[in-house]
Amino acid sequence: MDVNQAKQEHLLALKVMRLTKPTLFTNMPVTCEDRDLPGDLFLRLMKDDPSTVKGAETLILGEMLTLPQNFGNIFLGETFSSYISVHNDSSQVVKDILVKADLQTSSQRLNLSASNSAVSELKPECCIDDVIHHEVKEIGTHILVCAVSYTTQTGEKLYFRKFFKFQVLKPLDVKTKFYNAETDEVFLEAQIQNITTSPMFMEKVSLEPSMMYNVTELNNVASGDESSESTFGKMSYLQPLDTRQYLYCLKPKPEFAEKAGVIKGVTVIGKLDIVWKTNLGERGRLQTSQLQRMAPGYGDVRLSLEFIPDTVDLEEPFDITCKITNCSERTMDLLLEMCNTRSVHWCGVSGRQLGKLSPSASLSIPLKLLSSVQGLQSISGLRLTDTFLKRTYEYDDIAQVCVVCPYTSPES
C-alpha cells in the first residue's frame, strides 16, 4: 500500500488500516533423538512455548492467532474492509470535521463513507472512527482516497488527503466449452482453476440460465438412500493451481422448443455464480458475464432423429423416426428421396411428396431400413428437395446402429 504523506503539519492525524481475518500461528518444530547431544532440551523448549498445542508440540499449526503483518492480497469478489481513524493530536478543539473516503478504480469513483455530515467539534486526544466495506468487482489498480477537512479555533479552514494504492488480483481462471446436441440440448463444461496461493472451499458453483432454457446440474451422483452426493466429495476443497470441471445440461423451455427459428438464433446461455470461502470463513463471490455460444447452423431444413434403436438384427427390417423442421422464413414443398448404400438399404417408396411445410413447422416421418452387413453401420442417403426452388438438401451420416447376427453358428 503506497501512502502519499501530506507536506503540511496538521492538527489532525489520519490512520487507515485494512481489516482482515487473523491466521493461525505457525512454528517450526526442532526435534532430536534422546541419545543426541541436546537430549530432551528441544522437547522441553517446545512444551514451554505457549504457541504450541499441548500434547502435540511437533504440530506446525499452533493454538494462537496472529494478526497480518502486511497489507496482503485482495482478490476479485472479496469484500475490502478498512478502519479509518482521525485523531486530534493537538491541544486545541477542532471544529467542523468532515471525513470522506472514496475508492477510485479504472472505470469509476465510489463514495464509501458511511456518513457525509460533518462532526461539530473534536476535543484534544479524541478521535473519529469509521469502518468501510466494499465488494471488489474490478481487477487492477485501486486507490483509496481519504480526505479530511476541518476548521481551527482561529477560523482557518484546512484540508488534506492521503492516497492508498493497492492491486486487485484475479482469484479464479474460468474456461467454458459448449457442446450442442441434436435434441436442442446444450452441454456446458466449466473448468475452474484456483490461481491463488491458498486453498478454497467451494461453497456454490451454479449456472443461472437465460430465459429460454432450463438447467440441470450433472455434478451429483445418486446414492442408495435416494439422495445425491457431490462428485467432488463432502469436503469440497480446491487446492492452489488445482482445476475442477463442472457440467451442466440446458434444455429449451417448451414454449421456445417449438420455435425452430428462435432456438437457432440463441447465443446467450446464462452466467456462472461462484461462491467460495478462504481463511477462517472469509467469503468471496464471482459472477461471470453472460456466456455466449456459437449457434449451430442447420441451414434451411433441419433433419433430426426422434427414435432409433441402438442394436438391430442382420437382414431384419427396423424402424426409425425422423423429424424435419423448416428453419427458413418461407414455405417449402418437400420431396423425400432415399438412396441405398452398400450396407444399409431403405424399405419403402422413394420420391414421395411430403407436402407443404410452413416456417418453423416440423413434420415427423417413420421410415424402415434393413442392414445386410454386420458391425457398426452408418445411416445415410436421405435427400429432401424443395420443389419451389428446385433445391436439394443431402443428409448423410445421420446416425449409427450396431448390427448383430441373431443366429449362432454350430461349432465345427
UniProtKB/Swiss-Prot annotation:
Q: Which cysteines are joined by disulfide bonds?
A: none
One Pfam entry for this protein is TRAPPC13_N
State the source organism's domain of life: Eukaryota
Q: Which InterPro entries match?
A: TRAPPC13, TRAPPC13_C, TRAPPC13_M, TRAPPC13_N
- Where do the TM regions start and end? none
What are the record's GO terms for cellular component? TRAPPIII protein complex
Subunit composition and interactions: Part of the multisubunit TRAPP (transport protein particle) complex.
Question: What is stated as this protein's family in its record?
Answer: Belongs to the TRAPPC13 family.
Name-wise, this protein is: Trafficking protein particle complex subunit 13
Q: What is the lineage of its organism?
A: Eukaryota, Metazoa, Chordata, Craniata, Vertebrata
